[in-house]
A protein has these predicted regions:
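N-terminal cationic and glycine-rich segments that engage phosphates or anionic surfaces
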Residues: 1-96, 101-416
Length: 416
């Protein structure tokens, strides 16, 4: 990893991409401290400390929620818009065709939907936090809603700029940056926990550290793991030359969906609990908040189910066994022991299904079990399995892209 970073810094084009990404991180961090007008941030901070879900939301926003800055809603409206658009491309035939032919149009629709969802959520936030409003007039609420919507649109733009001109997936990196920025406060909490609980507290934190280390090792292993399906290409004689005859393989990753299922599931589950937390005096809202308590059994069960669902869903739309089998057949290849065409597609689909199930269950376990364990240990820490999966997964994906960029650069240099 360090050798890759060293090589990337030496190469001028990749160095520029890294510096641009870091510059966007700086803009993001500055934005988390630009306050929204007409809001008492002390009350917001108290609510975030009292409600676990709001505390978790504050973590992924990089502290922007507690500060109630222009980035307080984070990038979640964009994630929700992406989920809706991806589901619609499966349901609506016209959108499915558009997704294959014109991805830019789908991206444009996603941006429009993001702004709409952000404005609706901003209105809900403005009315939900009435106790924190310095001025509750219509003009003040409209100003707050428009400021929050503009902040989300700005974050979306920053994410797209990172994807286009920087290194890695911009949206994932914004969430990554938000979580990483809260690590110092998390470490300080653990220090206070040890001071308050003495030897028992130290043992609890040590156990937490060992589990976290084991989880990181497991996440890296699963992220890099793959099943290789052998493919043989028949020999062809053209004139006096013999073509083909070589062996290769189809790499099927254990976790082909990456951290996308975790981010999607988290974004969906945060919505009802967050809305409920806006109405602390409502009995119905309190019931909803308790049901969607991040340390509760129901929440974590639903979280695991959604992770499994989105893992299968995302794998299905990014990897088509029929297309793979057709490409193998066109190029004169075959999987040993199988006829080209439909039998090959069915075999690849079967292997993909088994591997995806294992990867999905692993993601669900890493996301859910640490949260339940911290609930049992009474650790009020938001750096659970979800944060770990996002940080490690995004870091690995970014390093892969950096390596690919360096490899492409070396090929271009060779061609010149």
């Amino acid at each position: 990893m360090f050798s890759t970073l060293k090589s990337a810094i030496k190469a001028e084009d990749t160095r520029k991409k890294i510096l641009f990404t870091l510059l966007m991180f700086l803009v993001f961090r500055i934005g988390t401290h630009i306050p929204v007008p007409n809001i008492d941030r002390t009350i917001i901070a108290q609510l975030a400390d009292q409600a676990k879900l709001l505390g978790f939301f504050d973590m992924i926003s990089g502290g922007a929620f507690k500060n109630f800055s222009i980035f307080a809603m984070s990038i979640t409206p964009y994630i929700n818009a992406s989920i809706i658009m991806q589901l619609l491309t499966v349901i609506v035939p016209q959108l499915e065709q558009m997704a294959k032919e014109d991805r830019k149009k789908i991206a444009e629709y996603t941006r429009y939907l993001t702004v709409v969802l952000a404005f609706v959520q901003a209105i809900g936030v403005s009315f939900g936090f009435k106790s924190a409003l310095v001025d509750s007039s219509f003009g003040s609420i409209a100003l707050i809603a428009l400021t929050l919507t503009a902040g989300t649109a700005c974050l979306m733009w920053i994410g797209e700029l990172i994807t286009e001109k920087g290194i890695g997936n911009g949206i994932s990196l914004i969430i990554f940056a938000g979580i990483v920025s809260r690590i110092p406060s998390g470490l300080f909490y653990l220090y206070q926990y040890i001071e308050a609980n003495g030897a028992i507290g130290f043992l609890v934190v040590l156990l937490f550290a060992v589990i976290a280390y084991a989880a990181i090792v497991a996440v890296v292993a699963i992220h890099e793991g793959q099943r290789r399906i052998p493919v043989q290409y028949a020999k062809r004689v053209v004139g006096r030359k013999v073509y083909g005859g070589q062996s290769t393989h189809i790499p099927i990753k254990v976790n082909s969906a990456g951290v996308i299922p975790v981010i999607f599931a988290m974004s969906i589950l945060m919505f009802p609990g967050t809305i409920a937390s806006f109405f602390p005096n409502s009995g119905f809202a309190t019931t909803i908040a308790n049901i969607f308590d991040a340390s509760g059994i129901f929440y974590n069960f639903l979280y695991a189910v959604l992770i499994v669902f989105f893992t299968y869903f995302y794998s299905a739309i990014t990897f088509n066994p029929v297309d793979v089998a057709e490409n193998i057949k066109k190029n004169g290849g075959f999987i040993p022991g199988l006829r080209p065409g439909r039998p090959t597609a069915e075999y690849i689909s079967k292997v993909m299904g088994r591997i995806t199930l294992f990867g999905a269950l692993f993601l669900a376990a890493i996301a859910v079990l640490p949260a339940l364990l911290m609930g049992l240990l009474d650790l009020e820490l938001y750096f659970g399995g979800t944060a770990l999966l996002i940080v490690v997964g995004v870091a690995l994906d970014t390093m892969k892209q950096l390596e690919s960029s360096l490899l492409m650069r070396s090929y271009e240099g060779f061609m010149k």
